[in-house]
């Protein structure tokens, strides 16, 4: 039955939808009817449709309004419809269908080797981590870099800083390296393979920013289908989601300068962090554009709570 419906959708769409606006409207309707799950770069059917259709047609994501009335060829309509059906039937993330994602206003190549960029840390980068950074940073570490989006966004925000982009996954580092080259930042952003801090020389940074795996087992068991296309290595973090965060907290002070700060995302696992370590003075950051579960600690605060995480030190 599904194959028959797909054939009907394809024939109907290719024959009756003529303009870009028609295609967007039809796609939004199909997405709404399919009860898709969003959250991988968009939070609604309209933005999801736009981010699927425009790259599929090799158009920029910010096309002027008059382009919406442009007519599409039958081959263009067919290409879009095939991707819409794949998004619905397979629950494949749009970014994996187009190999494009956006973060901090920058475009990135992505595929199933990395998570789709979506961290609220982007808002902090655009605000240059004010008021937390007291001096212009010269060394920044992006730990668990994935696609390299945070490292590259930091390099754009702080053009005088060197940025080390760390990940354990060779696949992820290959994607990050492609993005570094695409943005012309080979002399500023440096991909490095390491299991968190374990394989790194002990150098000091003004800022360590990290979006590590933090999904607890309960949430892993109930992940929407869309998120199951993403690499589990970038999501799962043990029963309480803090497996990697504890190691980061244990080792970060050794890699921070005197006035350095750690910014770490733990998402929904912030509940476990607050329950297990109520005495630690986490600064839980707030976001105007949505998001939660990101804390900040200074080097001094990390040193003060070192005993809590001594067991997890490399």
Curated annotation (Swiss-Prot):
Pfam families: MTS (PF05175). It is an enzyme of class 2 (transferase). InterPro entries: DNA_methylase_N6_adenine_CS, HemK-like, Ribosome_uL3_MTase, SAM-dependent_MTases_sf, Small_mtfrase_dom. One of its GO terms (biological process) is methylation. It catalyses: L-glutaminyl-[ribosomal protein uL3] + S-adenosyl-L-methionine = N(5)-methyl-L-glutaminyl-[ribosomal protein uL3] + S-adenosyl-L-homocysteine + H(+). Methylates large ribosomal subunit protein uL3 on a specific glutamine residue. PANTHER family: 50S RIBOSOMAL PROTEIN L3 GLUTAMINE METHYLTRANSFERASE, RIBOSOMAL PROTEIN UL3 GLUTAMINE METHYLTRANSFERASE. This is Ribosomal protein uL3 glutamine methyltransferase. The gene is prmB.
